[in-house]
Amino acid sequence: MPTSFVSALAQVRPDDYESAIGAAHRRFGWTAVIIMGVVGLWGLVLAVMRREPGRYYAVGATVASIALLVQVGMGLWVYVNDDAEWAGNQHVFYGIVILFTFSFAYIYRSKLAQRAALSYGLLGLFLMGLGIRGIQNFGQSFGG
């Protein structure tokens, strides 16, 4: 039986070393990455079919973007407020790269809109890849 996001969030139990926000960040990281990947693939399918993204795609892209930005926000909050050095600076680095990617997508939004399905599909897959790298590098740091 599927559970709602709110009931799933209520089940999050933090460990001794992290806050509830940290536990939510850890638990829902893959959810945000998968949603972004699905929307990215959806955009590529639309591009191959030579169709413009419609309202449903815009809603999906918005949900995926919000999910990923909430993840980054929770991660930064945990890093600043919980002194989460255990996360490793590579994990934090990829969160910051995700923020920069969203910033550049906003700056170049008029250029991206010229071939919207292809551009936003590739952007979604790129962001998914950054999220995967961030998860894979959890606990690792640059240098020694």
Where do the language-model regions lie?
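Short, strongly hydrophobic alpha-helical membrane anchors
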Residues: 1-24, 141-144
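Structural signature of hydrophobic alpha-helical transmembrane segments
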Residues: 27-34, 84-97
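N-terminal signal-anchor/start-transfer transmembrane helix
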Residues: 33-49
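Loop-to-helix transition at the N-terminal end of transmembrane alpha-helices
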Residues: 49-68, 89-90
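Cytoplasmic-side transmembrane-helix entry/capping segments in multi-pass membrane proteins
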Residues: 56-64, 115-124
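A generic, lipid-embedded transmembrane alpha helix
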Residues: 64-78
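Membrane-helix boundary connector in multi-pass membrane proteins
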Residues: 83-86, 103-120, 136
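Juxtamembrane boundary at the C-terminal end of a transmembrane helix
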Residues: 129-144
